[in-house]
Amino acid sequence: MTAILERRETTSLWGRFCNWITSTENRLYIGWFGVLMIPTLLTATSVFIIAFIAAPPVDIDGIREPVSGSLLYGNNIISGAIIPTSAAIGLHFYPIWEAASVDEWLYNGGPYELIVLHFLLGVACYMGREWELSFRLGMRPWIAVAYSAPVAAATAVFLIYPIGQGSFSDGMPLGISGTFNFMIVFQAEHNILMHPFHMLGVAGVFGGSLFSAMHGSLVTSSLIRETTENESANAGYRFGQEEETYNIVAAHGYFGRLIFQYASFNNSRSLHFFLAAWPVVGIWFTALGISTMAFNLNGFNFNQSVVDSQGRVINTWADIINRANLGMEVMHERNAHNFPLDLAAVEAPSING
C-alpha cells in the first residue's frame, strides 16, 4: 500500500488577518475601509463626548471673548456644543502638538478640528465599507451611492464652507443651538432661502418624507391576508418567503383612482428607485449649493425689484427677507466688527491726513 502525504498549506498571520478582515461571515463586516473607519469614528466620538461635557470656553472670533459650550461650563443639552476652532487659527492644521500647551489648544478650539476631520474621514470610510460589503456579496452598489448624499452634506458644512470662508470658525458648531445659529448666520450672509439648490433640497427632504409615508401606508393597506381576523396581519409574514406580501395591483389601482392612472407606479423596481433617488438628488443639490455659497456665489437678490411710475419702491417678500437678513447680520459676532459692510450704503470717504 502506498501512502501519499501532502504538505498542509499554512497561511501566514497576515493572510489570516486579510481573510478575517474581508470575511462576510463575521457578525459585523469590517473590510479594508473599516480598518480606517473604526479608529477615526471612535476618536471623533470619544473627543466629542469629553469636550461636550468638560471643554473650557473657546475664543471663536479671535477677539479674546471666549464662548462657553460644555455642560460643566453652564450649558444644557440644547445650548451646549463643540465650539468651532478660533478665527485666530484660520484654516491652519491645528493638532495638539502645534499648541504651546493643552490649555492653549483648548482655548483656541482644537477639539473641533480634531472631531470634524476624524468624523469626515470616518463617514467617508463607512460609505466605502458599504460599497465593499455590497461587492463581496455580489450586490449592486447603490446603497453607498445613496449614502453619499449625507456624506456630501456633512463635508459641505464642516469642510468646504470653512475653506471658502477662510476659517474653521465659520464651520457649523457641533450642537443643537449651534446648528441653529449656523443656519441663521448662513441665511444672513448668503440668502440661502433664495438659492435654487436649497429649494431642490427642501423638495427632496419633504418630498421624500411624503413618498415614504405614501408607500408605507399603501403597502400596509394592501397586505395579503394570511391570518385569521383574531391575529395580527403582520404574523402572516415569514422571513424569506417567496410569495409577495402585498398586492401591488391593488395598491396601483387604489392610487391610480385616487389621483390619476399614470401617477401610480406599476413596476416595483422603478418605484423603489424613485423613492431612493428623490431625496438623494435633492440633498446632493443642497450640498452643492452650500459649496458654491462657501465662495460667496449667493442666493438670488430680488431686492427693490418692483417700483411704481414715480420710482418709489414697492416692497415684495424679497425685500422683507432682506430686512430680516440685515437684522440677523448685525446681531451676530456683534463685537467682532464695528460696522457691517452690508449696511454701508455708500463708499466711505477718503481721509487725507
Swiss-Prot record:
Pheophytin a binds at residue 126. A quinone binds at residues 215, 264-265. It is found in: Plastid, Chloroplast thylakoid membrane. SUPFAM superfamilies: Bacterial photosystem II reaction centre, L and M subunits (SSF81483). GO terms for molecular function: chlorophyll binding; electron transporter, transferring electrons within the cyclic electron transport pathway of photosynthesis activity; iron ion binding; oxidoreductase activity, acting on diphenols and related substances as donors, oxygen as acceptor; oxygen evolving activity. It is a multi-pass membrane protein. The record marks 161 as: Tyrosine radical intermediate. Gene3D superfamilies: Photosystem II protein D1-like. One of its GO terms (biological process) is response to herbicide. The modification Phosphothreonine is found at residue 2. The modification N-acetylthreonine is found at residue 2. Fe cation binds at residues 215, 272. Tyr-161 forms a radical intermediate that is referred to as redox-active TyrZ, YZ or Y-Z. C-terminally processed by CTPA; processing is essential to allow assembly of the oxygen-evolving complex and thus photosynthetic growth. The D1/D2 heterodimer binds P680, chlorophylls that are the primary electron donor of PSII, and subsequent electron acceptors. It shares a non-heme iron and each subunit binds pheophytin, quinone, additional chlorophylls, carotenoids and lipids. D1 provides most of the ligands for the Mn4-Ca-O5 cluster of the oxygen-evolving complex (OEC). There is also a Cl(-1) ion associated with D1 and D2, which is required for oxygen evolution. The PSII complex binds additional chlorophylls, carotenoids and specific lipids. It catalyses: 2 a plastoquinone + 4 hnu + 2 H2O = 2 a plastoquinol + O2. One of its GO terms (cellular component) is photosystem II. 2 of the reaction center chlorophylls (ChlD1 and ChlD2) are entirely coordinated by water. Herbicides such as atrazine, BNT, diuron or ioxynil bind in the Q(B) binding site and block subsequent electron transfer. Belongs to the reaction center PufL/M/PsbA/D family. Photosystem II (PSII) is a light-driven water:plastoquinone oxidoreductase that uses light energy to abstract electrons from H(2)O, generating O(2) and a proton gradient subsequently used for ATP formation. It consists of a core antenna complex that captures photons, and an electron transfer chain that converts photonic excitation into a charge separation. The D1/D2 (PsbA/PsbD) reaction center heterodimer binds P680, the primary electron donor of PSII as well as several subsequent electron acceptors. This is Photosystem II protein D1.
